[in-house]
Amino acid sequence: MESQCRPNVDGVHNGVESHVKVVEKPRSVGSSSEFVLRILGLLLTLIAAVVAGVDKQTKIIPLTLIKTLPSLHVPVTAKWSDMSAFVYLVVSNAIACSYAAISLVLVTMLGRRGKGGRVLAVIVLDLHMVGLLFSANGAATAVGVLGQYGNSHVEWKKVCNVFDSFCHHLVASLALSFLGSLSFLGLVLLAILNLHKKSSTK
């Protein structure tokens, strides 16, 4: 009796041939979006850190000590390590880049089988990266505005009219860093959307 009820190896059950097609479930859109955003965050923060980290320009500046004497021409170098705000920008992007690489590996390994605690830890760290990058971008932007326009109230002169290449590289680094912070912000928003979907389906 048991042999009559069991299907044969070739897919024949009680004299009727059946064709079973196994279809793998495609990766969800949310997982694909998360992967893309982490790759973008990794690349953007890496390039931002490199662009700012190699930023350096030397110019010959005329220096007048006494009005009756001719000006002295002194070589002056502007580099990112001269200002703490720019150091903060480079270090923050380096941290975010390293975290993006590690989180990319973790998320790939965890997949859908990841425990809730580990997934929540990644989301919290994503949120920390958003705060870190936005604070670094804000600090560097404030110093950059002073370099571009100066401050007449405290007699701070603008320097970007002299070190133009230096300032242009910093603007490019800031733009990349800002886009990188938006990538991490997108990850946080995506996580909130996924949590909302899970709670609504329960």
UniProtKB/Swiss-Prot annotation:
Keywords: Cell membrane, Membrane, Transmembrane, Transmembrane helix
Pfam entry (one): CASP_dom
Cytoplasmic compartment segments: 1-33, 107-118, 194-202
Name of protein: CASP-like protein 1E1
Subunit details: Homodimer and heterodimers.
Membrane topology of the entry: Multi-pass membrane protein
Main location: membrane
InterPro entries cross-referenced by the UniProt entry: CASP/CASPL, CASP_dom, CASPL
Source superkingdom: Eukaryota
Family the UniProt entry places it in: Belongs to the Casparian strip membrane proteins (CASP) family.
GO CC terms of this entry: plasma membrane
Extracellular topological domain residue ranges: 55-85, 140-172
Keyword Transmembrane helix: yes
Regions that span the bilayer: 34-54, 86-106, 119-139, 173-193
Compartment annotation: Cell membrane
PANTHER family for the chain: CASP-LIKE PROTEIN 1U1
